[in-house]
Amino acid sequence: MPDIIIQPLNIADREWISQFMLEHWGSNKVVSRGVVYYPQDLPGFVATDESEKVGLVTYDITGSYCEIVTIDSVRPFSGVGTALIEAVKNIALQSGCKRLWLITTNDNMNALRFYQKRGFEIVAIHRNALDISRKLKPEIPLIGNEGIPLRDEIELEMILNDTASQ
């Protein structure tokens, strides 16, 4: 299998990102901690295998914090997600960020396992946060993975420093 190539997103990727978000997230709008994001307008990286796009990550840097807003791999367990996180981690370090963080939902057990295995720690559970998010994005379902009610945002972080080897 050929190597996965990680490249920065460019303006030509915007339409693809919008379509990808609609197909995989049901909307091209993302809500995190009460903030609405449009991933097609954010910086990020795309993972390709030959000419096929197999992964996407978008992020937002505010001050010394870098938030991973979206991350997706169409090939689970292939190293795509890990490579995308490493790309964002590197850009965060180059930008002087001290914290890499993200939000997932209480139903997303696969994400919780994935992030913790890569050095992220759970730092907060924002109870009933999705009630607020649904006011900004009504299409967020009430029931998530495995029939679990979607209620809470779970915040994970990785503290960054120049010698970080996580």
What do these predicted regions represent?
Residues M1-A12, I154, M158-Q166:
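Conserved N-terminal entry element of GNAT/NAT acetyltransferase domains
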Residues P8-P76, T82-E86, I159-L160:
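Acetyl-CoA-dependent GNAT
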Residues N28, S32-P39, L56-T58, P76, ...:
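Conserved acyl-donor/pantetheine-binding loop and adjacent beta-alpha core of acyl/acetyltransferases
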Residues S78-N90, R113-K117:
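Conserved acetyl-CoA-binding loop-helix of GNAT-fold acetyltransferases
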Residues A92-T104:
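Conserved GNAT acetyl-CoA-binding A-motif
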Residues L102-A111, R127-K135:
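Conserved beta-strand-loop-alpha-helix junction that forms the acyl-donor binding cleft
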